């Protein structure tokens, strides 16, 4: 496994856990870091960035209430949710929960209430994938719970670039927390990305993902060394690994010392 830095000639070995990764300079499109960027892998809740774009493209009333239904309950992984069946929320709050807190019921309800229903939603997703040139991506449902939702780091960079053009998505995914009215009670929800709001991080887009099949995944748009950078890290074995590698990418791009962890020579990246 190697991580290639296209503009570097150094043979410095960077410990790197994710199985696939791609980091690019947004303005130039230049590849800064790359590892197995064309491998097709499950993407878990990174899916929700696509869900959000398709929902926003439909230009529905964001103040209209959505009632969480039994149909929205996860029957794939049987994941829990802090949004109870029967709760009614404005669509804008449902979108907030789907993106910031990665709530699966929220994402499912957005697809269910899409004009024409879930079938029309999936059709719109396929059209969006085609429009973005994401030829190696398959999305069959809105949450990412299905391991059939797959993509490549290369395709996900395209998705991140597109999502960065949606003000609602960038605002929501960079909120560290929010209070949402659930059945008359104010409930605090937090961003699944602990780097959001953390000192030293200038984050302009964020989404995490996890399933057993997908491992720990993250997409971020950050500012590093004066550049706007898109970072996609896929299939890390643990949150700590994913987070260490995200920090190492930022430090490396900023010419700072990277954090070293014990790693075999087969899991080192050459940069």
Task: Tell me the role of every PLM-derived stretch.
Residues 11-154, 158-167:
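Active-site-adjacent loops and short helices of periplasmic peptidoglycan-processing enzymes
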Residues 1-10:
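Bacterial N-terminal signal peptides
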Residues 15-19, 91-92, 116-271:
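Penicillin-recognizing serine hydrolase domain
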């Amino acid at each position: 496994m190697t991580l290639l830095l296209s503009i570097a000639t150094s043979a410095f070995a960077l410990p790197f856990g994710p199985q696939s990764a791609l980091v690019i300079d947004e303005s130039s499109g230049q590849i800064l870091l790359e590892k197995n960027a064309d491998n097709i892998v499950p993407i878990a809740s990174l899916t929700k960035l696509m869900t959000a774009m398709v929902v926003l493209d439909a230009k529905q009333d964001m103040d209209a209430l959505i009632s969480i239904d039994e149909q929205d309950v996860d029957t794939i992984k049987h994941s829990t949710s802090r949004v109870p069946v029967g709760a009614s929320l404005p669509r804008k709050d449902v979108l907030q929960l789907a993106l910031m807190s990665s709530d699966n019921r929220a994402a499912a309800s957005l697809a269910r209430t899409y004009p024409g229903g879930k079938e029309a939603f999936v059709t719109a997703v396929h059209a969006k994938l085609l429009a973005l040139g994401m030829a190696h991506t398959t999305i069959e449902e809105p949450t990412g719970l299905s391991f059939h939702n797959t993509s490549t780091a290369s395709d996900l960079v395209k998705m991140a670039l597109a999502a960065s053009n949606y003000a609602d998505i960038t605002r929501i995914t960079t909120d560290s927390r929010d209070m949402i009215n659930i059945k008359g009670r104010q409930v605090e929800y937090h961003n699944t990305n602990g780097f959001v709001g953390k000192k030293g991080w200038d984050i302009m887009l964020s989404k995490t993902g996890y399933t057993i099949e997908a491992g720990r995944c993250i997409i971020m748009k950050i500012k590093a060394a004066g550049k706007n950078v898109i970072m996609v890290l896929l299939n890390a074995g643990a949150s700590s690994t994913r987070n260490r590698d995200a920090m190492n990418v930022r430090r490396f791009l900023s010419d700072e010392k990277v954090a070293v962890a014990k790693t075999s020579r087969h899991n080192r990246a050459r940069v």
